[in-house]
C-alpha cells in the first residue's frame, strides 16, 4: 500500500483483532508446528505421523503469497507436510530440523536485506524465544509456553495455532 503523501516517512500500522503490524512487512518468518498446526502429532496405524492443517491458515499462506509477501518456515522438525505446503505455494525458504533458529533468521535478514521494520516472527515454544527476542515484531499464540507470552513486545493472536492464528496474521498484513 502507498505511504501517506502528507507524511511520506511515517509507518502506517494495520490492526486486526489484537494484532497491530506496520505496512512495511515484506516477510513472515514462522515456526510450523504450533503455528500452522495444532501442535499435535497423530500416529497412524502404520506408525507414520500426521499433522492437521486448518484451511483458514492455508488460505492465509495463499493470500500472503498472492499479495507479494515472502514466507519463511523455520522448523525444529523435519516434516513432509512442510515440503508439500512449500511446493504448492512456492515458498522458497524452508528450513527444517533446525536446532538454533536464530542463525537461520539472521541469514534470511541478510539474504533479503531486511530491516527490523520489514519482517515479523511467529513462534510458540522455547526454541523460538531467541528469534522472538531478536525481532521487533513478534507474535505468539494463546497455547504458547508462558515464557513466550510474557516476552517484551509480544503480540498474541486470538486464535490458537492450527486454528486460524496464521490467517489472523495474514489478514492483519493484507488488510
Which ranges hold each PLM region?
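Single conserved hydrophobic/aromatic residue that forms the stacking wall/gate
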Residues: 1-11
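Terminal peptide-recognition signature
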Residues: 12, 34, 64, 86, ...
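Active-site neighborhood of HAD-like aspartate-dependent phosphohydrolases
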Residues: 14-70
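Short, well-ordered beta-strand core segments
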Residues: 28, 71, 94, 138-140, ...
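Short beta->alpha linker loops
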Residues: 56, 77-78, 99-100, 143, ...
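Substrate-recognition element of Asp-dependent hydrolases with the DxDx(T/V) motif
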Residues: 61-85, 132
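Helix-adjacent hinge/juxtasegments
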Residues: 76, 80-114
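Mg2+-dependent phosphoryl-transfer enzymes with acidic/Ser/Thr/Gly-rich catalytic loops
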Residues: 102-175
Amino acid at each position: 500500500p502507498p505511504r501517506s503523501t502528507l507524511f511520506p516517512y511515517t509507518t502506517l500500522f494495520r490492526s486486526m483483532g489484537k494484532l497491530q503490524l506496520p505496512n512495511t512487512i515484506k516477510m513472515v518468518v514462522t515456526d510450523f508446528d504450533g503455528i500452522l498446526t495444532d501442535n499435535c502429532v497423530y500416529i497412524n496405524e502404520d506408525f507414520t505421523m500426521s499433522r492437521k492443517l486448518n484451511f483458514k491458515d492455508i488460505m492465509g499462506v495463499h493470500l500472503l503469497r498472492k499479495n507479494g509477501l515472502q514466507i519463511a518456515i523455520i522448523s525444529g522438525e523435519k516434516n513432509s507436510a512442510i515440503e508439500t505446503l512449500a511446493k504448492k505455494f512456492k515458498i522458497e525458504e524452508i528450513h527444517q530440523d533446525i536446532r538454533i533458529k536464530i542463525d537461520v533468521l539472521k541469514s534470511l535478514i541478510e539474504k533479503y536485506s531486511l530491516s527490523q521494520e520489514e519482517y515479523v516472527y511467529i513462534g510458540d515454544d522455547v526454541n523460538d524465544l531467541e528469534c522472538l527476542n531478536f525481532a521487533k515484531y513478534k507474535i505468539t499464540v494463546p497455547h504458547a509456553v508462558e515464557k513466550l507470552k510474557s516476552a517484551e513486545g509480544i503480540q498474541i493472536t486470538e486464535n490458537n495455532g492450527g486454528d486460524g492464528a496464521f490467517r489472523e496474521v495474514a489478514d492483519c498484513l493484507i488488510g
